Amino acid sequence: MRRILIVVLLLAVIAASVGFIILKTQSLSDDQNFFNRNFRSKFAANEFWRAIFGLQSSGDARADYLGSRYKKVLIEVDIMQGLSAQISGLDALKDKIQKITGKPTDYIISDRAVRYYRDLDTELIDDLVDQYQIRETSGDTALIYLLYASRSQEDAGFLGLTHREYGIVLFEETLKEFSREDPGILANYEVSTALHEFGHQLGLDHNDRPGCLMNEEVEIGRFWERPEDVILDFCEFELQQLGFNR
């Protein structure tokens, strides 16, 4: 009897291990596989399981921002040497994130300048974030990490992108080119691009709807001539996707 029990336990351990390996492998894929369709959002809502399965893609920290566990949001801002952030843009971004999350939101600008690189690929961005990021989601505060960087090596037209499940990268030199150095348009471009990337961190995908913030044109840039023409809020369709019935 004892031998049978040991065999059963060993088989259970083996089955559990194999199951974990299969799910772990699927969790690392961007495909709409069984795990991602049925379990990813559930596991990602819990920090422990998020760490176990290595869930660090856009949208995996959605529950941190929209759930009830964290009561505040903090934006940690790092700026590459030679670049600058529009304070009016940061103030507006803070207010808009506070409105969408329903949580008091603030930002803090690091006093350390990030080493300048002319072009950035994903690997270099990872290295810079690992080197310069100080804070993390903890206590009652969910973190958003915002990096003002130079430009994308992979696509010179990219205005911004997401980093892991909590970060936003703004390509400031590209934003300045698209805004033609107009401070009013530049600040709104920064807000629009950052909020678009935050939408991805809330789990929103691109759409092709005119006037919607998650329209892919916001990410790759388009020439708005006036500050008031820049899209600065989620549209009704996107709010419904986030669970806001208005």
Describe each PLM feature range.
Residues 3, 181-246:
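The catalytic-center signature of Zn2+-dependent metalloproteases
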Residues 33-39, 71, 142, 164-166, ...:
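Residues that flank catalytic or metal-binding motifs in active/ligand-binding sites
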Residues 64-66, 135, 203:
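Residues embedded in well-ordered secondary-structure elements
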Residues 87-193:
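Metzincin-family zinc-dependent endopeptidase catalytic domain
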Residues 77-81, 174, 218:
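Short, histidine-centered active-site or binding-site loop motifs used for metal coordination
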Residues 74-76, 145, 167-169, 212-213:
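Generic structural signal for residues positioned in beta-strands
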Residues 1-117:
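N-terminal low-structure segments adjacent to metalloprotease catalytic domains
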